[in-house]
């Protein structure tokens, strides 16, 4: 059955760009890869080869692809920043009816990259895994053209400026379009064998699920249809489409793990009913049909996971949780301990450590964005895998032996101390994670480059132009000017929160500084220039991380004091008597401002005097997004310093000026 369109609405809403995309889809050849894309393919091959060396049979095909910036519609809505990181095969390999509503120029580029990645995997004898959100939002113009397919509203209302909807998977037309997209995907990428889908988060969701962010909602037609029928029917459609295309696939649907304040996607009764309707090879929430056994397939690769010190790159350290809990994970780089999604990567690493057996064992190893971290993990696994199931003493001895291969036997204890201290720092930072604190603060809220001034609302549009468009802020300027309003989460708000935040930072920084001291000892004792350069770079990256810790502390403290002072509404004395001293709160704010200026200048010097990468930056300005810092960061840090220095006199409008 072909879709029927609402033609007047369609003609009114389709943009010229969409029209061009449709024409291009019919006539344009396969995309020609840029030199940047070619270099990224070479990086993918190096990582995939490394994964194979470690025993991988599968690698994620979707990790590290260029993001779909065309989905920032309208341009000032930050919410797409969450879902564009996970490629949607429905938009990349669309049925003909869908083509006019997606950017086919972008799509051809990504399809070409995926095909080339598959050729690499074919050459290496590896298979592919696909990770995405599903069912993902569609552009509003699509639903205007096909109103019968509009499913639930799935955006987070406090983080989006636009109501965003996914498709209703109960509609036969939706199932047909998804089946066609699946067949198209597997025709281009035949190496894919396994799928993991996140749902109920980041622009995805099913009708009438209790956990939908705007509240339970959906298409009226399916309100009374059992959830088990709807979810199982959709997933079985995808598996059947793959079979019709000549492929046997496995699917694992993963609802977001609810935090304390969130509802579960499916009730226990709903989950049981869904699982019993699934065939083998399909799982929901890690339970495979039809009997609910633990899913035996490959786990998800999490594109969001960046590591406790992100946006700093290259700070790879072993995961030492086994030292305290007896768990078997061995590497931490690239993993966010506060996130339940991290468990997928840990499982892949545990699989990678397992000794080879005569039977066929499938292993997936994630291709993390940071190549240096992945190489470190590989060396660690290869060096210590023999002790992975040994006693704590055995494992510590193996770790010390690995440290000797990294820094030399004389410096092995120094390096072991570095790892212990950074592991402690990482663990303490967990307390502040509502999502990785450094990522949420410095990237989503641009603490790293935005100024701390008493009256941020008075900054001009030109003053804010370098950071304001990249704040994850869907509300107004009042919220955008608040340093701790991070995507409508004010978890660090108030003086009490300031003290708790400060307590965590004051325990983390000494560990980081202690690790830096050990790194400098290792550097000074290094036997040659190459080794000295390696440890010098590690030290500079650690210095940059310490700068970000200080900035985070300053931002939270500054906003707490600023809110307190403004709420008191005490009018400054216009003519203070001789002998008037500086008030404690004025001294607090101005000292915080000066500390942050000096701290930012330190970070700027580090960036200016280091040729290698310290911070993850987009390669070109056009690829800076809410989720990634841009290559202009050094200039932006200078701009931050200049703006803060230009507003010293503003403090006299908040406080009585001292007159000693």
Where are these regions (language model features)?
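Catalytic-core regions of glycoside hydrolase
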Residues: 28-157, 162-423, 447-448, 452, ...
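Bacterial N-terminal signal peptides
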Residues: 6-16
């Amino acid at each position: 059955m072909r879709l029927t369109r609402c033609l007047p609405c369609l003609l009114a809403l389709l943009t010229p760009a969409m029209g061009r995309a449709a024409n291009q889809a019919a006539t344009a050849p396969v995309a020609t890869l840029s030199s940047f894309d070619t270099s990224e393919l070479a990086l993918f091959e190096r990582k995939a080869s490394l994964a194979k060396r470690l025993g991988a049979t599968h690698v994620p095909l979707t990790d590290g692809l260029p993001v779909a910036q065309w989905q920032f519609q309208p341009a000032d809505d930050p919410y797409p920043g969450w879902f564009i990181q996970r490629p949607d095969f429905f938009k990349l390999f669309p049925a003909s009816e869908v083509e006019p509503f997606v950017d086919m120029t972008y799509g051809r580029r990504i399809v070409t990259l995926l095909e080339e990645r598959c050729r690499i995997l074919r050459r290496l004898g590896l298979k592919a895994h696909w990770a995405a959100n599903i069912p993902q939002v569609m552009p509003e113009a699509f639903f205007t053209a096909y109103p019968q397919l509009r499913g639930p509203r799935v955006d987070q209302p406090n983080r989006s400026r636009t109501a965003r909807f996914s498709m209703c998977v109960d509609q036969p037309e939706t199932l047909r379009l998804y089946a066609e997209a699946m067949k198209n995907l597997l025709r281009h990428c035949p190496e894919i064998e396994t799928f993991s889908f996140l749902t109920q988060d980041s622009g995805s969701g099913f009708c009438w699920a209790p956990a939908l962010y705007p509240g339970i909602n959906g298409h009226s037609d399916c309100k009374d249809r059992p959830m088990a029928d709807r979810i199982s029917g959709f997933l079985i459609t995808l598996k059947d489409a793959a079979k019709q295309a000549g492929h046997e696939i496995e699917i694992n649907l993963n609802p977001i793990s609810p935090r304390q304040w969130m509802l579960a996607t499916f009730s226990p009764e709903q989950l049981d009913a869904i699982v019993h309707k699934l065939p083998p090879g399909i799982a929901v929430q890690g339970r495979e049909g039809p009997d609910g056994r633990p899913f035996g397939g490959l786990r998800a690769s999490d594109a969001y996971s960046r590591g406790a010190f992100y946006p700093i790159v290259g700070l790879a350290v072993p995961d030492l949780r086994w030292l305290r809990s007896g768990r078997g994970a061995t590497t931490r780089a690239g993993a966010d301990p506060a996130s339940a999604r991290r468990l997928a990567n840990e499982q892949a690493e545990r699989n990678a450590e397992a000794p080879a057996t005569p039977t066929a064992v499938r292993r997936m190893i994630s291709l993390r964005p940071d190549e240096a971290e992945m190489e470190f993990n590989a060396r660690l696994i290869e060096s210590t895998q023999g002790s992975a199931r040994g006693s704590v003493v055995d494992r510590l001895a193996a770790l010390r032996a690995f440290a000797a291969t990294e820094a030399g036997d004389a410096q092995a204890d120094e390096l072991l101390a570095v790892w212990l201290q950074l592991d402690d720092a990482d663990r303490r930072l967990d307390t502040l994670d509502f999502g990785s604190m450094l990522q949420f603060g410095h990237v989503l809220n641009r603490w790293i480059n935005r100024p701390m001034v008493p009256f941020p609302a008075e900054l001009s549009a030109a003053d804010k132009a370098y950071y304001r468009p990249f704040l994850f802020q869907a509300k107004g300027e009042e919220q955008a000017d608040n340093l701790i309003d991070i995507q409508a989460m004010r978890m660090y708000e108030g003086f009490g929160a300031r003290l708790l935040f400060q307590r965590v930072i004051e325990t983390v920084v000494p560990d980081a500084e202690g690790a830096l001291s050990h790194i400098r000892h290792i550097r000074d004792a290094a036997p040659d220039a190459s080794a000295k350069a390696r440890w010098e770079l590690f030290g500079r990256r650690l210095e940059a991380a310490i700068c970000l810790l200080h900035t985070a502390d300053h931002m939270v403290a500054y906003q707490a004091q600023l809110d307190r002072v403004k709420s008191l509404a005490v009018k400054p004395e216009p003519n203070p008597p001789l002998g008037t001293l500086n008030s404690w709160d004025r001294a607090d704010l101005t000292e915080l401002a000066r500390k942050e200026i000096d701290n930012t200048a330190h970070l700027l010097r580090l960036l200016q005097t280091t040729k290698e990468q310290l911070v993850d930056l987009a390669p070109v300005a056009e690829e800076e997004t809410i989720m990634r810092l841009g290559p202009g960061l050094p200039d932006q840090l200078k701009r931050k310093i200049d703006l803060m220095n230009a507003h010293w006199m503003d403090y006299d409008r908040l406080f009585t000026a001292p007159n000693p």
